[in-house]
Amino acid sequence: MKMTFRHYGPGDPVTLEQISQIPVIRSVVSAVYDVPAGGVWSRESIRAVKDAAAAHHLGFEVVESVPVPEEIKLGAPGANVLIDHYCENLRRLGEAGVKCVCYNFMPVFDWLRSEMEHQAPDGSNSLAYDEKTVLSMNPLVGELSLPGWDESYTKEQLRGLLHQYESVDEEKLWGNLRTFLEAVIPVAHEAGVNMAIHPDDPPWGIFGLPRIITNEKNLKRFLKLVDMPENGLTFCTGSLGADPDNDLVAMAEEFAPRIHFAHVRNILRTGERQFHEVAHPTECGSLDIYGIVKALHKGGFDGYMRPDHGRMIWGERGRYGYGLYDRALGAMYLSGLWEAIVKSECGK
């Protein structure tokens, strides 16, 4: 297992120097953030990310993410050209030494939350989701003031995009995903890059949009679309764990050989389709983080891991979910679990 830490480039309030001071971190997860979805990343821009990390003795082996344009998800005209661009990005990333690319196939919204600063009794704050609040902000009937909307879309553009998806049900989305994978996975194989799809967050349909990377059954179906080792998963415990029907411990062990990237975080479920994010340790939330990490090890996981969304603590301000302090605590906690599990297993 290789512990990593996400960094959002030069504009990130968390600096590479700070990340390099977290004892267990040897590599950053980053991307080229100034090229729109569907564009081709220049070799120079990829090299700049790698060189910036190397200046602080950090590697750059995981990209999160190379966004999949909506035209590909829709199966719209021009999708083939954009798939070609995606393949070229994989070739260039492989040339630069990148080993894993995290991406998602969520229509329109990468993720949704109803509150960005949910206050805890101890004074910390975190991201929260309440289905009733989210549905009250339906873009087809109301104002778009909900945290998490993609600000690159105007209200009119967003409504238009949602209208296009009215003809895309789950099976059509599965078909478009297959088309994408059949093109990119062989290229990823040649480039030495593992592809790791991120689950839908949250793992259920929103505003009539289909969501398909949601549970054990669908993860099995996904892996069979193109049954090659490079076609793998990002195992995000917080995303999948929002649905109490998902047995994360069992899934972690089952899918471990095809999990190339693990996002490990805890959430506290407070009602039906209602949760907020908490500190990483098991005792803080609804997820058995120890059990999940142990299951990953038992299943043979040998990929990249990172602490996921953290709380804002100790007065820190910055990018929601991506402050320094709580994620650093999470990295140390997860690394401690892993070390203890490895050494206890070796001692048997």
For each of these PLM feature ranges, what is it?
Residues 22, 40-61:
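Glycine-rich, positively charged N-terminal anion/phosphate-binding segment
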Residues 88, 120-144, 215-228, 327-331:
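Acidic, His- and aromatic-enriched active-site or binding-groove loops in soluble protein domains
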Residues 1-18, 51-54, 71-75, 83-84, ...:
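Histidine-acidic metal/acid-base catalytic patches
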Residues 21, 58-73:
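A short glycine/small-residue-enriched secondary-structure motif
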Residues 92-96, 100-178:
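Active-site-proximal, glycine-rich beta->alpha crossover segments in alpha/beta enzymes
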Residues 13-16, 22-35:
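N-terminal ordered "arm"
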Residues 31-47, 207:
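Glycine-rich, proline-tolerant flexible connector loops at the mouths of alpha/beta enzymes
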